[in-house]
Every structure is written in structure tokens, then in C-alpha cells.
Amino acid sequence: MDRRSFLKLLGASLGAAAASGSYYFYELDWIKVEQVILSSSKNNGSCRIVQLSDLHIHGLGFRERTALKILEKLNPDVLVITGDFIDEPDGLRPMLSFVKEACTDREAYGVLGNWDHWVEGKGGPSGDELAGMLCDHGVKMLINKAEPIRDGIVLIGVDDPHTRRDDVEEALRQVGSSEFKIMLAHSPEVVPNVEGWVDLLLAGHTHGGQVCLPIVGPLYVPSRLGKKYVSGLYRAMGTVVYVNRGLGWSFMPVRINCRPEITVIDLR
């Protein structure tokens, strides 16, 4: 389905929701915490990782403040943000304020998403410039590179797979075979290139479909893999894949049966 078809179907869905007095309009700010527990003999001790994705920040509103409060309560050892920090130049300043607060007193790592590159076409910073700003505000950006975070655990970040900027070969070249390998990628479109090569892949991009109707499911998933990896937990040739539904939105400010998400990954 192309964007025009999606918007037409979305309009019809919103009309039906409005006519029924549906609560779905409130889902934009109704954040859900999802938990994943993984065990591996490669880990030496425990580690709590919290994943944020697809912030698409336009301002510091109720949803962003709620996310910061949730993050504080979860108290992760490591925070990871899997791309799409902004989609409009006006979102840059509030996004950097959000990121600075989110990263205070904790390790934080990130990768770029498609909109982090595309925003340059709207008069915003380039992807490289944005990555530099994020580093200055507390996020260590892993652009096709790896970084050990704990004894036996290594993070591997790749640039955006949706726009084919990822260099999986270069990123994997930097790690050994014995570590527990966690890859950060904006889109699950990278799965065919990494399945069996990493232990855990954390991605976003899909927004979980954003608008999901009963029986029909997600109306539109912006991925070359279609609806194969929409949201939640999957396994691909020994690789655990987790796709986060994101905090923000695309096209229109609405979510239906698809609440925004913060993911907690407890490694034991």
C-alpha cells in the first residue's frame, strides 16, 4: 500500500472511530512498557537495557514528559535509541532537550533512522551533523561500529537500513565470536543480513503499523519485508529480534490498537 492509499484508508478508519466515540484517539499518549527477559551463558552478570525508538519529537509535551518519568523509574544500566529522533527541523531543539534529560547519569547509545537523514531536505541538519549534536547531548552514536558495554556484551550499531546506509559487514568485523552481540538498527529490514550472526537485534521504524484494525491488522508497514516484522518478539535463525512500536507517529497524529512503547530488556 502506498502513502496515498494509506491516508485514504486511515481517513475512513478515523471517521468510523469518531462516529463510535472510540477511545483510540487517546492512544498517542498512552505509553506501554513491554518487558523482555533473555538468558545467555555469554553474559557475565545481569544488565538492564531500555529501548526507545521513533521519537519523532515536535515538542516537549505530555507524552515526552511521561516517557522521561517512566525511564527514571525503570533505572536502566544502558539506554538505547533506535533512530528517527526528529522528522521536522522545528523538532531539533526540544528533541535535544529530551535526549539530554534522558541520558543524564546513564550510558546511552543510538543509531540514525531514515527521517534523521531526510530532515536535511527540509532545511534541517544532515545525518552526520545530527549524530554530532546527539553525541554532544549524551548519546554515543554507533554508525556502523561496535562498542563493548559490559564484560561479555557488545553493542553493534548500523546506519539506517531503510535507506540502505547500513554497513553490516564493517560493523560485524569489529566483534569477536564469544561476546553476546546486540545489534541496534533503525529498521528490521536488516534481519536477512544479520540473522544467525548476532544474538539480539533491537529495531523500530514500523511504529507497529500505527493503525491496526481488528482482523485486518496493521494497515500499512513501511518496510521492504512487509508485515513480517511489525512489532514485538521474533526469532530468525538463532537471532532474537525485537521491534519496538516507537513513541511518536508518522503521517497523522493518531494510533489505533497500537500504543506507543518503551521496551525493557533484562539480560541474565
Predicted segment positions?
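Short beta-strand/loop segments at the ligand-binding rim of alpha/beta enzyme cores
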Residues: V175-M183
